[in-house]
């Protein structure tokens, strides 16, 4: 951790991981609906980060279709810092890619499966996220607290 503008600032993902704890996983929305079987299988993943002084959140939204259903699941993993600090943008992005998305993804998968089961449909199998396979761009992950 370094001092930047008089505030402790994380610039290393490993140090951020060591000085934070996963304290909550919030499910914001999940929905499913029956559709025509002719609808093509689809999958998309959107990721946002929210950074505060003592906590930050990696929020992921999945949309999927297949097996006669369309699904939406939106959840966020909340990490709490040991003490107030800033997180450099690149460090927050790398943490989201390597840790945050992987923490949230099982909850998204469960929400989609639960929606399919509620509709009496075969559950769609969401793709496997491989280490290093999630790459975020600046426009995809910029939501900060003021």
UniProtKB/Swiss-Prot annotation:
InterPro entries: SecB-like_sf. It comes from the Bacteria. Keywords: Chaperone. SUPFAM superfamilies: SecB-like. Chaperone component of an orphan antitoxin chaperone (AC) system; there is no toxin gene in close genomic proximity. When expressed in E.coli complements the cold-sensitive phenotype of a secB deletion, suggesting it may have a generic chaperone function. Does not however complement the toxin-neutralizing effect of its M.tuberculosis paralog Rv1957 (AC P95257) in E.coli, probably because the antitoxin genes are not from the same family. Belongs to the SecB-like family. This is SecB-like chaperone SmegB. It comes from Mycolicibacterium smegmatis (strain ATCC 700084 / mc(2)155) (Mycobacterium smegmatis).
């Amino acid at each position: 951790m370094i001092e930047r503008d008089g505030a402790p600032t994380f610039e290393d993902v490993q140090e951020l991981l060591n000085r934070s704890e996963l304290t909550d996983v919030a499910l914001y929305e999940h929905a499913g609906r029956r559709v025509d079987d002719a609808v093509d299988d689809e999958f998309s993943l959107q990721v946002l980060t929210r950074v505060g002084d003592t906590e930050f959140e990696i929020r992921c939204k999945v949309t999927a279709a297949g097996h006669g259903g369309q699904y939406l699941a939106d959840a966020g993993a909340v990490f709490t810092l040991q003490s107030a600090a800033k997180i450099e943008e690149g460090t927050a992005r790398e943490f989201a890619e390597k840790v945050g998305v992987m923490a949230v993804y099982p909850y998204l998968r469960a929400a989609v499966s639960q929606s399919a089961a509620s509709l009496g449909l075969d559950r769609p199998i969401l793709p496997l996220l491989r280490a290093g396979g999630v790459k975020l761009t600046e426009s995809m992950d910029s939501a900060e607290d003021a």
